Amino acid sequence: NWKRKLHVSLAFGEQGVYPGELCTLKQIIQNKKRMPLPALQVKFQADKSLQFQDETEAVVTDHYYRSEVFMVGGRKQITRTLPFRPQCRGKYSIGQIQIAAQDFFMSKKYVAVLPENTMIYVYPRQLSMKQLLNHNKQVLGEIVERRSYQEDPFYFRGIRPYQPYDPMKHINWKASAKYGELLVNSFESTYSRDVCLLSDVETDSVFYRQEMQEAAISAASTLADYYLRKGARVSFRTNGREDTDEEIVLEQCQGIAAITALNRRLAGIDLAKDSADFARMIRQIIPNCRQSRQYVCITTRPVRDILEAVTLLQSKAAEVLLVVPQIAGEDVQIPAGALAWNI
């Protein structure tokens, strides 16, 4: 049997990346039997948006089709590393490999299809927060504040003279000996902000439909990254649907690991599927909204029904922001009080 002790596999070198990052796909061929295979053909296809750098053995049309012939000696292993740079958000997989071989007389050809299950997440493209923060820093708020309730020992501010109310454990003995007076470590005061991001993936744009949808997803991912890295607890809800039709709802995530978890869900949003009504989604959370939570609504289409829902949410919650991502060439009327994000 020509397939006996022959193993062919593909494996992405990374589990999750951002668009434009350099990634690798490893192609491994193992022939564990003594008999060599003089001409083993290996074929597979991948999404063309992955943009493989080596196209010498490939054809790119609707997909990236690669076909390569190997001479595999007995008890030998061949490893190919194929670099690529993904260009678009998504969840990409390679489901099968086709192999073919001929006998020594080239009179017979044997073909087999091998199942494969390698996958990579391409996260939403990250946007620049500079333009948004420069104009709206006081609105978005800082997670680290000087006038909060409790000092956090993880946020070191500096050294100051000792005061009678300072605990002994805060005395910096090394600095005190150096300067000849009692000095204590000073810390920033912090609080953990509770943020809920509501993301609309639908758009009214005709000429820039996909660009506007991707801008909304990227804006949600970038804001979530910003808040999570600041130490906030972030909840997330979107009217987009994954390829499994599952609704994307995350509650009170925290920490760097939550960024990966959220981006994986956002990578799986299938824009070909019908999205839920965003205004209705906002109205559904109003009965259970919290005064202590900051709500951030992200939409590229601030139409009447959405604005009415946001206004109703503002009447129930203490802090509600409306963020409107914009792209060049698309004229969107920004409502009063909304934060425009030029992308």
Model-flagged regions — what are they?
Residues 2-246, 294, 298, 312:
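An amphipathic, basic-hydrophobic helix/alpha-beta surface used to engage anionic
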Residues 47, 163-167, 255, 277-280, ...:
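General structural signal for secondary-structure boundaries
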Residues 187-189, 226-228, 253-257, 285-288:
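Short, conserved, surface-exposed binding loops centered on an aromatic residue
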Residues 245-276:
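Short, charged loop segments at secondary-structure junctions
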